[in-house]
Amino acid sequence: MIGDLFVTGMVVPELGLAIEETTKTLGVEFTPIQESPLQMRTEKGVEIFNLRFVYSLGRPPHLELIEGIPDGYYDPKGGYIRHVGLWVDDLADASAQLAGSGMPLEASGMNGEVEPYAFVFHALPWGLRVELVDRVQQPTFEAWLGGGELHI
């Protein structure tokens, strides 16, 4: 396996309602809502937006609920499982491995001119998406799950 599975991400039309219903029906507890400015390159070009999301608390793999953004990379279209996420030690190498195995690069995180930065997405034509996340981000992420602030 290229990395360690840690999350399944779902795009939802209304984040607050999704949190409420998931907590009520499944007893899942979530982090506070995180709002994070994000810049990424997609097949449509560079997208810059504020991403709103939560992660389930407890042991991984986590459930990530992402508030949909119409007409963008996270278009809600009724809510769906968006991706599985893997921690990787070498983002560029793992991304090249997926691309070389027939799973093309779909989007990559950016930090100004630095690309890829923090994460990339690869996708198969039938819908499976894999998010590779640089393991350098893991300590910050785990501190956030423990009640700290998330800085991407």
Locate predicted features.
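A short, polar/proline- and glycine-enriched secondary-structure boundary/capping micro-motif
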Residues: Y73-G79, F141-L145
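Extracellular/lumenal glycan-associated surfaces
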Residues: V7, E21, V136
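Short, solvent-exposed coil/turn segments
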Residues: L5, F49, G79, E115-Y117
